[in-house]
Amino acid sequence: MANYRNNPFTFVYDGAITKNEKGKVNVEKVSYKINGIDIAANVYKPANYTPNGKFPAIVVAHPNGGVKEQVAGLYAQKLAEQGYVTIAFDATYQGASGGKPRYVDKPANRMEDIRAAADFITQYPGVDKNRLGLLGICGGGGYSIKAAQTDKRFKTV
């Protein structure tokens, strides 16, 4: 396992991005609010990203108890290597996101988190809002399926 202390993005997986370089996948730390609570997220951009492009996007939902720097970040990075703009976020009350009590994992909150990530990424420069996908890992997968049932922006899950 990679040592997160040696990585400015604190990613914990082998092969993780350690710096942004031209011509490679780059990551941008971003934040937005859900009902007044700060949400921490990372946007992964493909090597050929331009803000004037029309890139498909994918929201990546982490497992229960996970954070964006773990497996969700790995999937987000790998998908960006395939040409997608991706967003991996810390759910409300978890990781670097705000909210109390900490470590709460309620289905309604997680579905709202997914929809808010979709709101953010579909407004991101260079993203084609009509080509939005959703990937959920473990518990995030169940929440993703439920969120996609009512949010028709997601064209694939």
Residue ranges of each PLM-predicted region?
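Alpha/beta-hydrolase active-site loop
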Residues: 71, 104-125
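Conserved alpha/beta-hydrolase
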Residues: 78-98
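The serine-hydrolase catalytic nucleophile loop
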Residues: 65-77, 91
